UniProtKB/Swiss-Prot annotation:
GO BP annotation list: translation
GO molecular-function term, one example from the UniProt record: structural constituent of ribosome
PANTHER family in the cross-refs: 60S RIBOSOMAL PROTEIN L11-RELATED (PTHR11994)
Protein name per its UniProtKB record: Large ribosomal subunit protein uL5
Gene: rplE
Function: This is one of the proteins that bind and probably mediate the attachment of the 5S RNA into the large ribosomal subunit, where it forms part of the central protuberance. In the 70S ribosome it contacts protein S13 of the 30S subunit (bridge B1b), connecting the 2 subunits; this bridge is implicated in subunit movement. Contacts the P site tRNA; the 5S rRNA and some of its associated proteins might help stabilize positioning of ribosome-bound tRNAs.
Family matches, as InterPro entries: Ribosomal_uL5, Ribosomal_uL5_bac-type, Ribosomal_uL5_C, Ribosomal_uL5_CS, Ribosomal_uL5_dom_sf, Ribosomal_uL5_N
Keywords attached to this entry: Ribonucleoprotein, Ribosomal protein, RNA-binding, rRNA-binding, tRNA-binding
Length: 180
């Protein structure tokens, strides 16, 4: 069974986007390509256990096993060695991507303290959107009692949009709560 949001996009939202953006061919309408969830763990330099806990939490949030990112080169000022683990990242595609986006928009973002909407300016010029989340505990999959340290994560939504207006229209139709 396809994800709820994907079915809604195929049946209803694609036609609305085509009409709004003036496209004739359904393949011209922008769609989600992938979502990259990244957790940078600079403090893992001193404490290796942080990586394991973060990988576990990221797997719970996304439903997919993360890749541990390693330092490309040594930087003495940061006490960083080449090959040392400094983060974790997951690339979501297909149904998992739509389900994660649905949970992010409908459950996680409304749980952020003093949430007034996400910035409409965080597009990169090519229709992709990046969002920073300060606390991983906004996701219902994370058990607050088992969290040792509150960490943030970056979520990048990659779309097939050609420019920011198309990307903004797509995310607005998919339910992203932009600030007014």
């Amino acid at each position: 069974m396809a994800a709820r949001l994907k079915e809604r996009y195929d049946k209803q939202l694609r036609a609305e986007l085509m009409k709004e953006l003036g496209f004739a061919n359904p393949m011209q309408a922008p769609r989600l390509e992938k979502i990259v969830v990244n957790m940078g763990l600079g403090e893992a330099i001193n404490n290796g256990k942080i990586i394991d806990a973060s990988v576990e939490q990221l797997a719970a949030i996304t439903g997919q096993k993360p890749v541990v990112t390693r330092a490309r080169k040594s930087i003495a000022n940061f006490k960083l060695r080449q090959g040392q683990s400094i983060g974790a990242m997951v690339t979501l595609r297909g149904d998992r991507m739509y389900e994660f986006f649905d949970r992010l928009v409908s459950i996680a973002l409304p749980r952020v303290r003093d949430f007034k909407g996400v910035s409409p300016k965080a597009f990169d010029g090519k229709g992709n959107y990046t969002l920073g989340v300060r606390e991983q505990i906004i996701f219902p999959e994370i058990n607050y009692d088992k969290v040792e340290k509150i960490k943030g994560l970056n979520i990048t939504v990659v779309t097939t949009a050609r420019n920011d207006e198309e990307g903004r229209a797509l995310l607005r139709h998919l339910g992203m709560p932009f600030r007014q």
